[in-house]
From Swiss-Prot:
Keywords: Conjugation, Periplasm, Plasmid, Signal. This is Conjugal transfer protein TraF. It comes from Rhizobium radiobacter (Agrobacterium tumefaciens). GO terms for cellular component: periplasmic space. It is found in: Periplasm. Belongs to the peptidase S26C family. GO terms for molecular function: serine-type endopeptidase activity. Its main location: periplasm. One of its GO terms (biological process) is signal peptide processing.
Amino acid sequence: MRRREVLLFLTGSRVRHVRTGVDSLIGGYRLNLTPSEPLGLWRIEALHRPVSIGDLVFFCPPMTAVFDEARRRGYVRRGLCAGGVAPLIKTVAALAAQNVEITDHIVIDGRSLPSSVVRKTDGEGRVLLPDPGGVVPPHHLFLHSSFASSYDSRYFGPVPDSGLLGLARPVFTFDP
């Protein structure tokens, strides 16, 4: 009888834990465990205006071969977005119709983007292929993080704005 009580308790605890996690996801909260932005709890805030350069946003990556490879390499975590990946937090660096040049760093409409060195290899020595750059297509965003090893539009290119979930607002965060 004692074993059954313990199993019921553990099952109930697990259900409560999962329920709390699901409620947080539905409630617009996300846990950031990547160094691209401060670690901790973030909230997704609905965007009631057009997205702007400098906005820190959550977005769901599109289901593309580039993101399939990113998931295989461990650049993106598993999550609830289409394709089974977690939403990413990035800063909007360029909007549709802006020209992005990608060489050893990023230049947007003739102006260098700070903290935008383009790496040739990742932390494990694997080749990183930069996006070729060009004009950001309609309904797309070029996203960036100032974290040197960030996986962002330097490598995956502009993303459809349909994947935009909202503004990223820190709730309880810290820099490692």
